[in-house]
Amino acid sequence: MADSIIQSPELGDVTGYLRERIRTVPDWPMPGVMFRDITPLLQNPKTLRVLIDVFVHRYMDAQLDLVAGIDARGFILGAIVAYELNLGFVPIRKKGKLPFQTVAEEYELEYGSATVEIHADACKSGDRVLLVDDLIATGGTMMAGLKLLERLGATVVEGAAIVDLPELGGSKLLQDGGLPLFTVCKFEGH
């Protein structure tokens, strides 16, 4: 799957510009994994602005009501995008981190399972929501977020992430599950 090329008069290939600034950490958190570290994008004010602008320009006319972000790096991207679009932000958290009544969704990991939660009053029926995370690997976390939002009556307009690892099957799982997906760049491998 080739990256879709996002062009800018000032930067040229924005996709390539951002992709080149994502650090690859071999064998972390375990041998054989090539960890795609987005923190260099966040640390530099220019790359952070370019990254946020990509999402803002994509969604500024999407008639959204909310942006939901997945714990933890999806909070960073999602909250900034929500602010720039003048929308509210909904955190989707790991189990036990939200103080009010919650709705939960369990999902499978490579070795076991995990649970994410959302406040029961986080959105209402008919809300149009953008669902954001930093990276799509197996797709389990974003699929769980999708199910939570839909259970509360929201329509998830699109899932969005900085990085897609298509060989792990997550983007296919999400698209096959009916979720349109936008990612800034793709990397081969794990």
UniProtKB/Swiss-Prot annotation:
* Pathway membership, UniProt: Purine metabolism; AMP biosynthesis via salvage pathway; AMP from adenine: step 1/1
Subcellular location(s) per record: Cytoplasm
What superkingdom does the record give? Bacteria
GO BP, one example?
Answer: adenine salvage
What are the GO cellular component annotations?
cytoplasm
Entry keywords, A to Z: Cytoplasm, Glycosyltransferase, Purine salvage, Transferase
Spell out the Pfam families in the cross-references.
Pribosyltran (PF00156)
Q: What is its EC number?
A: 2.4.2.7
Quote the catalytic activity from the record. AMP + diphosphate = 5-phospho-alpha-D-ribose 1-diphosphate + adenine
Q: State the InterPro entries in the record.
A: Ade_phspho_trans, Adenine_PRTase, PRibTrfase_dom, PRTase-like
Do you know which PANTHER family this protein is assigned to?
A: ADENINE PHOSPHORIBOSYLTRANSFERASE, PHOSPHORIBOSYLTRANSFERASE DOMAIN-CONTAINING PROTEIN
**Reported function:** Catalyzes a salvage reaction resulting in the formation of AMP, that is energically less costly than de novo synthesis.
**Partners and quaternary state?**
Homodimer.
Read off the NCBIfam families from this record. Answer: apt (TIGR01090), PRK02304.1-3 (NF002634), PRK02304.1-5 (NF002636)
Protein name, UniProt field:
Adenine phosphoribosyltransferase
Mind giving the lineage of the organism this protein is from? Bacteria, Pseudomonadati, Pseudomonadota, Betaproteobacteria, Burkholderiales
